[in-house]
Amino acid sequence: MQFTSVYGLKNIVRFGSVVTLSWLLPLSAHAIDVHPTAEQIQAALDQGKEAAQKRNPPDTFYVRFGATDELHPSGFLITKLGGLSVMATHMALRGLQPSEAEVTQVLDGQTMLVSTVIFGNAPNFAVDSYMVFEQGGKAIKPVTVRFDGFAHRSAAWPESPKFKAKVIASFNYADFDPKSHTTITVFPATGGESSFNVDFSRIH
């Protein structure tokens, strides 16, 4: 996966048609709390441990959006509390528990990760892709963007869409409203766009 710093990138040009997908966020997801309380932190760690006891995968705590099939764009984001639950699940499955330093490292994170899967018909279609948030008419740029330099065959191969690729971005918490309705849009350099309507206030 290739990596790109996006400081200094200029205005984005929109190409082609828009694919807009909405998905109700799961009730098990964690709110986007930038400064969670001690009670919230402990609850997130306990939920991760409980998930491991039930043999549930760590990605249970991802906040998913977009399509649920294998041929349309989708994605997920990881909140701070969700990240704690993911870590606690991973470690509990190995008979361990997170240290204070590991918990602090997650809580001190300045950015939120957003991962998407998009589709195209060329193996390099995702190269130089870009992602933005839009909140109340304001475009919010990510700190970094990564993308698959070579896409994988989709479930439709050899029919269209032939390929799927990941585009992953990190957004600074200080740059966006964690309680606002948000449109997440991915722009492949080859044209087109995939948009996801996500109401951050509904993440609980």
Predicted region positions:
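N-terminal secretory signal peptides that target proteins for export/translocation
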Residues: M1-N11
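Prokaryotic Sec-type signal peptides and long signal-anchor helices
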Residues: Y7, S17-V19, F65, H204
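Short, intrinsically disordered, low-complexity terminal segments
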Residues: K10, P26-S28
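Bacterial N-terminal signal peptides
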Residues: G16-P26
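Conserved functional micro-motifs across diverse proteins
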Residues: A31-H204
